[in-house]
Amino acid sequence: MTKSELIEKLAMRQSQLSAKEVESAIKEMLEQMAQTLEGGDRIEIRGFGSFSLHFRAPRTGRNPKTGTSVELDGKYVPHFKPGKELRERVDAINV
């Protein structure tokens, strides 16, 4: 699902809100989440999951075009850990 599909679906379910209002709310929510992670804080949405930063240590990588070794700096990457309720709902999907 894309952001625009989410906005469309929420606008249909919440008839008292226009698509523009839903879009504004989604954009603001995502901006607040990004700012929280930028500040090094963790986000927890009970039942859904949590977002945090994990540090990826410096390492030696490889340039796929040339095959030469490249030193990569350490960096923080966003990490999502699903909550119990979300895990249970996904586990219940019959394949």
Swiss-Prot record:
GO biological process: DNA recombination; regulation of DNA-templated transcription; regulation of translation
Region (Disordered): 56-76
GO molecular function, one term: structural constituent of chromatin
Gene3D superfamilies on file: IHF-like DNA-binding proteins
SMART domains registered for this protein in UniProt: BHL
Pfam families for this protein: Bac_DNA_binding
Record's keyword annotation contains DNA-binding: yes
Subunit structure: Heterodimer of an alpha and a beta chain.
HAMAP family assigned: IHF_beta
Record's protein name: Integration host factor subunit beta
Species the sequence originates in: Shewanella woodyi (strain ATCC 51908 / MS32)
Organism lineage: Bacteria, Pseudomonadati, Pseudomonadota, Gammaproteobacteria, Alteromonadales
Encoding gene per record: ihfB
